């Protein structure tokens, strides 16, 4: 089930981003798929927690392939597909390695690895995919707000997930202790 949630969240993020206009909140520009991208880091952490780091890379590879196919079907340009795939590979690998190396509670590993992964995901994709360096959808002046808007949303999602995981783990400890 964890693997399915991980893969479906990636496909859904691509579809939602293509289907809906970005959300504009003041100066911030947030593609609608951003809400699901934050979740992909959490689902990937759950996959890794169950299957281990080595097998998780196999699922990341499958997700990478699936994402490229879906992006191509949706009509994304080659530069967007390339930027998306490179961003995904870097952000997911970084999240995986941080999650693996931290010797903290699961909730804190999810939080910290997800925040770093989210920052990388936001910065790399906006610069390589959306700025004048990429597909030129955003002028350079809008790039910082686009990155920051995505980072804020992804960080909030990571924080909520960390709280839920923390509460769930505390409740299960209490239930076992009773």
Where are the regions that the model predicts?
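Transmembrane alpha-helix/helix-exit interface in multi-pass inner-membrane proteins
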Residues: 47-53, 57, 72-80
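Structural signal for membrane-spanning alpha-helices in multi-pass inner-membrane proteins
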Residues: 13-18, 67-74, 125, 129, ...
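Residue-level recognition of pore/gate-forming positions within transmembrane alpha-helices
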Residues: 11, 63-65, 88, 118
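Cytoplasmic-side transmembrane-helix entry/capping segments in multi-pass membrane proteins
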Residues: 1-5, 53-63, 105-112
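Hydrophobic transmembrane alpha-helices
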Residues: 1-54
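Membrane-helix exit/interface motif
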Residues: 43-47, 68-74, 94-98
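Membrane-embedded alpha-helical hairpins and interfacial helices in multi-pass inner-membrane proteins
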Residues: 77-178
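Interfacial aromatic-anchored transmembrane helix boundaries in multi-pass membrane proteins
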Residues: 21-32, 67-87
